[in-house]
Amino acid sequence: MEAVVFVFSLLDCCALIFLSVYFIITLSDLECDYINARSCCSKLNKWVIPELIGHTIVTVLLLMSLHWFIFLLNLPVATWNIYRYIMVPSGNMGVFDPTEIHNRGQLKSHMKEAMIKLGFHLLCFFMYLYSMILALIND
């Protein structure tokens, strides 16, 4: 059972890594004016809920399988994703709003957040890979 948890976590982490890279590429395209703010934000807002669900499922799965250290490592990022989604003002298009993305350095903060998430998911990828190999050897 432990190996199945880490295989699923590893696959989910791969998807989240690709999603983080997609966020970085799309935000850098907006920064360089290759795409407009409306199309950038609509592309990114499509993937906010799948990212939220994917990370939350892995976090809950780690809690249920009693992997406390990895659960506690994932908990702040999952909490931040939920908080960011809940705190979207009612008039905004989503987490990424085209009317406000160039205001108050939001583009830079979104880019920094995407980079931090990419580093976090890469760290988790190798942790899950190590744990999966260890679980397969012990079975």
From Swiss-Prot:
The chain crosses the membrane at residues 5-25, 57-77, 118-138. It is found in: Membrane; Endoplasmic reticulum; Endoplasmic reticulum-Golgi intermediate compartment. GO terms for cellular component: COPII-coated ER to Golgi transport vesicle; endoplasmic reticulum; endoplasmic reticulum membrane; endoplasmic reticulum-Golgi intermediate compartment. It is a multi-pass membrane protein. This is Protein cornichon homolog 4. Belongs to the cornichon family. Keywords: Endoplasmic reticulum, ER-Golgi transport, Membrane, Protein transport, Transmembrane, Transmembrane helix, Transport. PANTHER family: CORNICHON-RELATED (PTHR12290). It comes from the Eukaryota. Involved in G protein-coupled receptors (GPCRs) trafficking from the endoplasmic reticulum to the cell surface; it promotes the exit of GPCRs from the early secretory pathway, likely through interaction with the COPII machinery. It comes from Homo sapiens (Human). GO terms for biological process: endoplasmic reticulum to Golgi vesicle-mediated transport; protein transport. Pfam families: Cornichon. Interacts with Sec23/24 complex components SEC24B and SEC24D. Interacts with CCR5. Interacts with ADRB2 in the early secretory pathway. GO terms for molecular function: CCR5 chemokine receptor binding; signaling receptor binding.
